[in-house]
């Protein structure tokens, strides 16, 4: 509400709430910090798990940052912005989501301290941008170059990504599976290695133990053979991929046929049979003995295919069809009229197997497959889900390392090194921005501090030891959460992809700067609740932060 010559002037709709200046900044910073604090206890190998129960009573148990943040329902817009940071981190690199969120929360906490000292938000924002730019430069300097053939380092990266996800009993095997999967689908072009992790299918099946998780050099489908008379096992498979139905097409116009003679009805049925027989003959004549169809297969077509000894699967998802094409070298056909043997893919074996209580179709032994499957097993549904999330993180982390050819050590070492270098560099800026750079350097310490806290160690003692080691030039010194000692993480073999750190720092800085620059919140009146929600008039309640 504004005033003109002492008279109130109503500009905003009645019920609209407006918060301005420092109150708006404090409210946004508080909301962001609450979200960061919610996931902070999950960080690191000793991080705790969260049990999430949705409105239907479904339970998710995880310590994966992005999974937690996707499941919780928040109303505050600043909190939603922090959750977007986790989603971006997950989409770009697949790991480091908790790191990004915790760092964003700490950057805002340190910014609030500067605001209390009457430092303008624009100056803090500029200082943070300078610091982030310098931090990425320092990270590149301390990064360790690797090649896609450094299997041991790649396995260590996968192990680091999976640690704390309940996979410890078989972590070496799972790490090897993740590395082999990435190496199988990696492709080189113009001297650059490219890895599209979409072509690594993670199929989950409850039953057995984690040790039974396996890498399949082909595709596993959660489907079964359509007809009992079809073979359940085909060796030296010639595979046809079809994205149209194996059925007689109906006309688009709403036509009716009046049959007056029973013989004509018989001829009509025979004509349909002949058309289906012709379709199957084309498939068989092209040399196909396995058919994967994206749509339906007519009962009669199933019979003819079974009679010809062809294994067929229907209603295959489009994404699986694309993976089958990549794995077997087949082309996805829309029309059988143009079918030839060149369109078929190859696999050493296609068979239906019983996994747990259900049947699945395995396409294995593909020559140089560019799509593979990791079949995850585990005793309970929650275990399988969490192991699958861990493997997905590991696969994405290894893919980043292979593509970039650079890694950094973990355990809080890079954050302390960058923090130290930023403090040395800050005085060269002059002006109040150096205070923001120093605040940025302090904020980075939240990562090793949290790792220590979550392991039950004294964070102050750990930070003092870490800083002392880095002051002496030990740039790979990090905290060993098992012993509480500061050790060389390069020798210990704790590695993370460089991209995980650069993306986390970049995303956290961007969202912190964006939130800092907001000085006015105008919230429209919410939809009215049922009477009793906010007194007699049913006024909407204020959202909780």
Curated annotation (Swiss-Prot):
CDD domains: cpn60. InterPro entries: Chaperone_TCP-1, Chaperonin_TCP-1_CS, Cpn60/GroEL/TCP-1, GroEL-like_apical_dom_sf, GROEL-like_equatorial_sf, TCP-1-like_intermed_sf, TCP-1_chaperonin, thermosome_alpha. It comes from the Archaea. PROSITE patterns: TCP1_1, TCP1_2, TCP1_3. One of its GO terms (molecular function) is ATP binding. Keywords: ATP-binding, Chaperone, Nucleotide-binding. Coiled coil: none annotated. Pfam families: Cpn60_TCP1. Molecular chaperone; binds unfolded polypeptides in vitro, and has a weak ATPase activity. Forms a Heterooligomeric complex of two stacked eight-membered rings. Belongs to the TCP-1 chaperonin family. This is Thermosome subunit beta. It comes from Archaeoglobus fulgidus (strain ATCC 49558 / DSM 4304 / JCM 9628 / NBRC 100126 / VC-16).
């Amino acid at each position: 509400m504004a005033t003109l010559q002492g008279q109130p002037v109503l500009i905003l709709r009645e019920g609209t709430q407006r918060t301005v200046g420092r109150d708006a900044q404090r409210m946004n910073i508080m909301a962001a910090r609450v979200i960061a604090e919610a996931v902070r206890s999950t960080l690191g190998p000793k991080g705790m798990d969260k049990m999430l129960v949705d409105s239907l009573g479904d339970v998710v148990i995880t310590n994966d940052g992005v999974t937690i943040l996707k499941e919780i329902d928040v109303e505050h817009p600043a909190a939603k912005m922090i959750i977007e940071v986790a989603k971006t981190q997950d989409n770009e690199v697949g790991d480091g989501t908790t790191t990004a969120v915790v760092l964003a929360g700490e950057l805002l906490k340190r910014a609030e301290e500067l605001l209390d000292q009457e430092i303008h938000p624009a100056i803090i924002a500029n200082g943070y941008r300078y610091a982030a730019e310098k931090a990425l430069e320092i990270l590149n300097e301390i990064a360790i170059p690797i090649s896609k053939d450094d299997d041991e380092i790649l396995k260590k990266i996968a192990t680091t990504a999976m640690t704390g996800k309940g996979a410890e009993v078989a972590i070496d095997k799972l790490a090897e599976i993740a590395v082999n999967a990435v190496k199988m689908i990696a492709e080189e072009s113009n001297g650059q290695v490219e890895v599209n992790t979409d072509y690594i299918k993670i199929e989950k099946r409850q039953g057995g133990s984690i040790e039974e998780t396996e890498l399949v050099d082909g595709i596993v489908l959660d489907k079964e053979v359509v007809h009992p008379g079809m073979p359940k096992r085909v060796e030296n498979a010639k595979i046809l991929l079809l994205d149209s139905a194996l059925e007689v097409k109906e006309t688009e116009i709403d036509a009716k046929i009046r049959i007056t003679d029973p013989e004509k009805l018989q001829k009509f049925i025979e004509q349909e049979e002949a058309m289906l027989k012709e379709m199957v003959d084309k498939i068989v004549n092209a040399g196909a003995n396995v058919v994967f169809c994206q749509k339906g297969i007519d009962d009669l077509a199933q019979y003819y295919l079974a009679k010809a000894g062809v294994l067929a699967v229907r209603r295959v998802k489009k994404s699986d069809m694309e993976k089958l094409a990549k794995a077997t070298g087949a082309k996805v056909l829309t029309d059988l009229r143009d079918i030839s043997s060149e369109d078929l893919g190859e696999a050493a074996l296609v068979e239906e197997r019983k996994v747990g209580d259900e049947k699945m179709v395995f396409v294995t032994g593909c020559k140089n497959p560019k799509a593979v499957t990791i079949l995850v097993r585990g005793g309970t549904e929650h275990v399988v889900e969490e192991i699958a999330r861990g493997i997905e993180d590991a696969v994405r982390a290894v893919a980043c390392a292979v593509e970039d050819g650079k890694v950094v050590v973990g355990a809080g070492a890079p954050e302390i090194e960058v923090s130290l270098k930023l403090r040395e560099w800050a005085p060269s800026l002059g002006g109040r921005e150096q205070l923001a750079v120093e605040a940025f350097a302090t904020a980075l310490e939240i990562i090793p501090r949290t790792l220590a806290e979550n392991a039950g160690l004294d964070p102050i003692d750990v930070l003092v030891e870490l800083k002392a080691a880095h002051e002496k030039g030990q740039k790979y010194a990090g905290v060993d959460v098992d012993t509480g000692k500061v050790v060389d993480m390069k020798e210990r073999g704790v590695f993370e992809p460089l991209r995980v750190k650069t993306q986390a720092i970049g995303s956290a800085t961007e969202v912190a700067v964006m939130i800092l620059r907001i000085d006015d919140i105008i919230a429209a009146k919410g939809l009215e609740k049922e009477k009793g929600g906010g007194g007699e008039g049913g006024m909407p309640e204020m959202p909780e932060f």
